[in-house]
Structures are given as C-alpha cells and as structure tokens.
Amino acid sequence: MAPTFTNSNGQPIPEPFATQRVGQHGPLLLQDFNLIDSLAHFDRERIPERVVHAKGSGAYGVFEVTDDITDICAAKFLDTVGKKTRIFTRFSTVGGELGSADTARDPRGFATKFYTEEGNLDLVYNNTPVFFIRDPSKFPHFIHTQKRNPETHLKDANMFWDYLTSNEESIHQVMVLFSDRGTPASYREMNGYSGHTYKWSNKKGEWFYVQVHFISDQGIKTLTNEEAGALAGSNPDYAQEDLFKNIAAGNYPSWTAYIQTMTEAEAKEAEFSVFDLTKVWPHKKYPLRRFGKFTLNENPKNYFAEVEQAAFSPAHTVPYMEPSADPVLQSRLFSYADTHRHRLGTNYTQIPVNCPVTGAVFNPHMRDGAMTVNGNLGSHPNYLASDKPVEFKQFSLQEDQEVWNGAATPFHWKATPADFKQAQELWKVLKRYPNQQEHLAHNIAVHAAGADAAIQDRVFAYFGKVSQDLADAIKKEVLELSPRK
C-alpha cells in the first residue's frame, strides 16, 4: 500500500501543490499551513558543513578479529578470534567543501565507528601515516591556508606554500601529499593510518604505545595529477560513485588491520618522539602485527541521516584503549565533540548512526537540550542519587603509568634538521618505483607555479633540504610554467 501524503503533524493533504488564496489569482492566506510548513522546513534543511572533511562517503560493514592480541589489548570486542563487530566507515577529503571534487590532491579521512558491546569506539584516521603539524595551536592557521583567500575567495598558492615553507616540520607529509599517494584512485584502494600514537593495555596492567594500520586488500592504486584533474572536471563525485556502486554490486572492499607497538622503555630509546605526528615508526624495528579484518558490505539508505550526520571523535574510546600524550591528539579529544555539538546539536549521540547499539548509555546528569528524543531517562533523578543504586564497572588494572614532571610552560615544537630525515628516506624509497620521483617533482611544480617568485624560491629551498636533485627538478619545471621577466 502506498503511503498517504501528509504535512508534518500527520494531517492528510489532498492536493500538495494547491495554495489557499483569495479567489484563483488573489493574495495567499497565512493560514495555509501546508505551504508555510513546507517553506519553513525548506529554509532550515541545511546544517553547517564540517569545517574540514566536508565532502565524504560512507558505508556499514563488519570487523572480525583474526589474531589474538590480548597480550596487548584487553578490549572486549578483541577478546576472541572470530568475534565480529558492526562498523560504519566514512571516507573524505580534508580541505574541500561539500561540492568539491573527490579526486583533489588532499589527504583522505578514514574514520571508523565500532559499535561494540562496551560503547562506540571511533578510530578517526587518515590515508597518510603522518601529518603537517605537531603543535595543535597551528591547526586553524594551517587549515585556513588550505582553503580560500579571504579577499578573493580563491584557492591561493601563495598562502599554501608560505605556510608550509615557514613550518618545515610539514615536509614529510608534503612529500606524501604530492606523491601519487595524494590522489588515490578510489577510497577502496588506499590504506588508513592512525598517525597518532595511542595507549592500549592488557588485563595484567601492562600498557603499550600503539600505531594502527588498515591495509587495503584491494591494493594501492593512484591517479596521476592529470588523471585526477580530468576526473575532477568530468565526474567530481567519482569516489562516492565508485564506493556505492561496488558495494551495491556485491564487490565488497576490505582492509586488514595491523598494529605496531612500543613499550615505554623502547619509546625512550627511539630516535624520535612517539608523540610526533610528523614521524613514522620504521617497520623493520617495529614490525606490523595483524589483528583483524573489516569489510564494508552495506550502503547507507539515506546520505544525510547516516553520512552527513555521522559524528566521530578520538575521545570515543572503550576500556583498555586510551589516547597518548600526543599534543595534536589531545586537542582533537576536545575539538571533535565540540564541532559536532555545533553542527548537530548537544544530543548528537542520540542520532541513530551515532547511538551505541548496547542502549546502555546511563549518565543521568547529561539531560535535556535540543532534540532529546530518547526518553530522557524518564523519572530518574538528574544526578547520581544515593537512593538509586548504580554499578561502577572497574576495567583498568594499570598501576604503572607515565610520570610527568615539570613546570607549566608554553612550548613550540620547532622544526630542526632532523625533521628532514624521514622525508629524505622517502625520496630514496620513491626511486624504487618507476617514475615516482619524477611525478613528485612534477606535481609540486605544477602547484608551486601559481605562487609568486619569492614564494617559489622558498619552495626550492624547502625541498633542497630533502634533495638537491628534487629541488632542481621542481625549479626547472616551475620556471618553464611561469617564466620570470
């Protein structure tokens, strides 16, 4: 049976396109609730877009434990090989707006929500293992340079390269971004990385620093700069279409999950800080260890309800998993939930895609607010009342934690020559693959050619600290593309 058309209060409407008026061609009547209701709702359809990661695609799936890592982490959803957990993953670009191209040269967001029996776990990752900054106060400045000039409202190569060359700790991520990894062929054919260091613990009270890797079972495929640009013009929703159609056709993408681990003693001996988001952990010294696999096998039924309203936060953890002292991660613990309250409202966790499946959310002091739709805990007191028994579940046996000692001090983690070491190693790695060094130099040159000469000279010097061959190749093409008088 077909549904009956109604207005928002459920009243049947016999003619949806008729409007009440004085005669057939007279003025409209304010009492026409169908018209007023429809227009008022239309005026409020849009919510604020994400300030970063605005353009995205998502799908549901399942995570399965493939290997026992209970010696590292006692999280309940990992306690048994073969155990399965429902998930929702959202992929995204970072800098573009909602209508921007999926193939833009940009990092890709790779956020996954695990609906576990002990609450929702959000792993909010990217497709690159490092990032541009390690001082969180730089984040708003950095993002502004990746967006639009406030005067012209155009993307601005001067802003872009002025910031990066002034903050040289960015070099490693910039090398990744301007390699062909910066333009993935699809969301299915890219990896995901925690980037940040986390702390996981076992039931003995032992804890470990952890980095997580999601390795695409489809392999890595990329686009050249020219291929990505052509697709941006011909099909800006290319990655969204690819993901949706493949899942609809039963071609379910999957990723294998690995961890790298360090003890506190190993971290103290490492040649870099485990809290430095601009560095990777060498695989030879800190090998990958498999623990699971996840498959995306179900498309959303409604994009707005399930993808646009999906809200992830690294502060959403489960027992035996916690953040490290990584300063950028620490700032994200606040910022993500704060932006969701702005975009979606104070009760964003009641939206179905964000709601824990256990139904076991009990925090009686967090009540009321706009769009409270879950019963609001009924008649229960809105505080922890002494006459209402509450269970407090103990889950952590950790006794031996990090010890921090020092005065409160403002600290700017400035770049040093050591920040170019891993970028130099990446340059050598690219030589192993056909044309990848040439593609990197070309991709940088095409972008930097749009900057002023003074900024271009800083770009040449910036990459010269990685390799003079790289800097020379960039300079040669830049001057061909934008000859100087």
From Swiss-Prot:
EC number(s) per entry: 1.11.1.6
Binding-site residues for heme, renumbered to this chain: Y336
GO cellular component: cytoplasm; fungal-type cell wall; mitochondrial matrix; mitochondrion; peroxisomal matrix; peroxisome
Main EC class the enzyme belongs to: oxidoreductase
UniProt superkingdom: Eukaryota
SUPFAM superfamilies xrefs: Heme-dependent catalase-like (SSF56634)
Quaternary structure and partners: Homotetramer.
Full protein name: Peroxisomal catalase
The organism of origin for this protein: Candida albicans (strain SC5314 / ATCC MYA-2876)
